[in-house]
């Protein structure tokens, strides 16, 4: 099976210019795992006959049954480029052998946290797009994440066999389809990228440069313009020139590639290229891409699928394809597969595209360092990362935990950015909450073993230098999900990953047999480790809650919990949605609360955020770590805040970074700074557990208007101020028309035209509304985009399929929070039911506490 040993891989690991770390990303069901197979079989790990069917990287049993990828899987490939191909590489290189660390990631939106983890440890991405359905919502989400992490994309148009056999497109129509997809992808890149002047330079994709592949993963064939340009250069050169040197040949091929795409036409009568669509005699000329590339492919398809024996034999001879004796007896689709696979092997084309156009760690870490490392940009660790220096201090990021075969232990999976990691090395293991100079979230322990990940297998290895992806044994006890591993004493953390979805659906679980409770608790701990997104919470009422990104995500998590992590039967509640609390107007009166000893008074008001500010805080455009003046200017310009107030933001909350703000608008108050910490603590408490039903607050700005304090410090300690601050904040919320917010999914549904009506019916029943409907050009498919409350999304997929005869495919992504209309204090409305249910579930007393409990008289 594997035709190279660990020692060989280890020797290449030192040639960091010849390493490529890349992930395969795409919309669900666009054929990532199938395509990955062609790469794996080229690099000699699957027998080539089974490629396209094995989906080697779907390692779990449920992945094979459901035919979807759930966890991202890593695999190392070895590929040698010929002298001729080496000439195309524009960055530094070292010999002709390349080590490609490939991560196949899931496309389903519920698992997009897995994608984030995969992106963090790679430098390049192969974006797969189904050429029939085009660029979908998930393609955009994933691509946006990749660009935010400064990862260079190359594009692969998959499923060309469908375009030819099912849709029977004409060559010109097919060219237009490709052209449109390339444009769509470039629009996304230019919207979220940093432009040509940015540190990465131009990352737009362009078939002319060879950064776009075309082909079919299922049939195992693919090409970029480079393959065809080479054929034609060889053909034209045969007419009288001898062997060319690799660099000259490279120039010729690159010139040829420019002629094979875009508005270039070919005149068969004299064999010349022209820029106009008609020749001198006024005859219409075919486009070069159609004539020189698609036409031969169409001919092969046509001859074989229509069983034209003589023509097929002629073509095979002309294309110089050598078939085995067993292949010669095949016909129809089987013969087509063998012929196309011999003529344009997918592995070759893709591996060449990857090695030539994706960056090596040496190239990539120069511009990724500032995004990855939180510390100062010139300390030892940062320099080590920037230069990818094996002699620098060890800096390694753990992006996720991978369960081992024996229950309960995990490999830590991550990438070495600087230094060398080796078995038995004593390292500093820093969790996400570690701050330099403090002891919390820091362990100093030896690494037990380092291992190589090979899809379904692991191989032990002595040590691994920087630029490589590796698994560690024995670190799992000290990290929950992610973290940084270093040998440098003053190292800061690598920056935490930003997830594009948030866990909004929760389920309560309990053991069927109460005696199994300890096992359940242990199982929940392991579950929290194994999935980057999942949150396991224990409520005050003693319930165990699991929060996930969506229905499917939770289903998989519960299955894992039951079968792998806790190994006990489990009872689960119906899924519940997390809500947020907010206010809709400014407080109707100035709120005052007195401290328990009656010596201190706080006066405050609450008001809602202007539209868009909460989202800016979520995205990190406005944050607690920003420089004061920059932030104040941003708030003043974009949201028309008063600059002096914007400079006096005390803090964000909950957790110091959430979408609520505490500002100080007082004028000349004595002792104010002494109680600042206590008020901030009260604010964090109040925003984490709101007054309506103890959910987080969102989008509320609290202003401290006035404070009267006791002159004696002993009478204004934390015990006096913190509870007072919380009471006054609650009073502010209650006087400012409090409202509930619910999470909303953006649903994208692909379906044929005739079932669009059925979709509207289902959405209307579930409080959804359609805001965009478009036809995918060149196909009979429609795309409907709608907003759907997460609360209504349970069973939505099944409902939709039954109403459309199984022809509609929905894809839900968490999009935004929206206010639930209605007053939570009016017993007839929806929000009041939600408040009552949530309070009951959390074991709080019935009914929201009255305003008098929080408000004091002067």
Swiss-Prot record:
Cross-referenced Pfam families: EFG_C, EFG_III, EFG_IV, GTP_EFTU, GTP_EFTU_D2
Cellular component terms per the entry's GO annotation: cytosol; nucleus; ribonucleoprotein complex
Binding locations of GTP: 26-33, 158-161, 216-218
Enzyme class: hydrolase
Domain tr-type G: 17-362
Keywords assigned by UniProt, alphabetized: Cytoplasm, Elongation factor, GTP-binding, Hydrolase, Nucleotide-binding, Nucleus, Protein biosynthesis
GO biological process: translational elongation
PROSITE patterns in UniProt: G_TR_1, G_TR_2
Keyword set includes Hydrolase: yes
Diphthamide PTM sites in chain numbering: 715
Cellular compartment(s): Cytoplasm; Nucleus
Subunit composition and interactions: Binds to 80S ribosomes. Actively translating ribosomes show mutually exclusive binding of eIF5a (EIF5A or EIF5A2) and EEF2/eEF2. Interacts with serbp1; interaction sequesters eef2/eEF2 at the A-site of the ribosome, thereby blocking the interaction sites of the mRNA-tRNA complex, promoting ribosome stabilization and hibernation. Interacts with habp4; interaction takes place at the A-site of hibernating ribosomes and promotes ribosome stabilization.
UniProt function note: Catalyzes the GTP-dependent ribosomal translocation step during translation elongation. During this step, the ribosome changes from the pre-translocational (PRE) to the post-translocational (POST) state as the newly formed A-site-bound peptidyl-tRNA and P-site-bound deacylated tRNA move to the P and E sites, respectively. Catalyzes the coordinated movement of the two tRNA molecules, the mRNA and conformational changes in the ribosome.
Protein's name according to its UniProt entry: Elongation factor 2
